[in-house]
Amino acid sequence: MEIDVIIPLYKPGKELFTLLDKLDSQSVPVHEVILLNTGEKYFEQLIYGTRFLEKYQNIKVYHVSKREFDHGGTRRMGVKKSSADIFVMMTQDAMPADDNLIEQLTEPLRDQVAVSYARQLPREDCAPVECYTRDFNYPAQSRIKSAEDLKTLGIKTFFCSNVCAAYRREIYEELGGFVKHTIFNEDMIYAAKAVEAGYAIAYAADARVIHSHNYTNVQQFQRNFDLGVSQAEHPEVFTAYPSESEGKRMVKDVTAYLRKNHMSGKLLHFYIQCACKYAGYLLGKNYRRLPGKWVLAFTSNKEYWKQNRKDV
């Protein structure tokens, strides 16, 4: 059984070499690493003088322009470049925590499980609120989620992250793969399709990657604007199971956490951050009512709109 890893890139730094070295030392070997690079000149600058292709002989590099990149479509392209039975989607800023990542991530892929996703651990520089959010979304206990969990988990049933997730090709092809065009959320849209088809989603807590961000309020606003857009464009997934209740639960949990750990001074910043996220989300869900200039100002992915909306 072959396992490939597919990684979209944009202006990668030297951390890419560390990531590739860690993938090369996994307990279960990776057959090929497929790099989907946006912006060829940045990649060429990175590897200049490194003998990159000599050192990493199992790597294939494909270049796309910034305008061509799409969260769903580019990943679909990567899957087509692979012939492996199982493929792992990763992002360039996700670092394997140990040599067992691929083994632990692919272990649940049996029976009705269509996709498994890894636990995300915070980086050393991670802010306290973001650290707690990692634990909220990626707890220490593994879980299999299916249609039977919709009544209790709601939208969380479909939660899956292409920061690090493994897919069974046979089921992927059966379901039609990732959505061709989306600004965000291609992983959850696929997971929802899998659950609705009778398959399950595995959260593999023992498969761990280091991945976190300390986003500014503006960045949070923009990311959540794009999140809202993705939900508005896919009502078949998100209308029946809105995410607002899950957001409210996280606010309550983080508030309790900060108070319990004598960090009440961080509450104001946290609430402002939440307001920025929620405002972005609401505007994104209603993007069709907004002027094109507003959409371009609010989004973190301007190229998406240049591809998909004539009035922007």
Residue ranges and their predicted role:
Residues 183-190:
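Acidic donor-binding loop at a coil-to-helix junction in glycosyltransferase catalytic cores
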Residues 226-229, 240-312:
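Non-catalytic, C-terminal membrane-associated alpha-helical segments of glycosyltransferases
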Residues 65-82:
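Glycine-rich, basic loop-to-helix element that forms the pyrophosphate-binding segment
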Residues 12-25:
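Short, well-formed alpha-helical segments that are part of the catalytic scaffolds
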Residues 147-167, 183, 231:
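A recurrent flexible, glycine/aromatic-enriched loop bordering the glycosyltransferase active site
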Residues 23-63:
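Acidic donor-binding segment of Leloir-type glycosyltransferases
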Residues 99-131:
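Conserved donor NDP-sugar-binding/catalytic core segment of glycosyltransferases
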Residues 87:
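Short aromatic/hydrophobic "clamp" motif used to bind/position activated sugar donors
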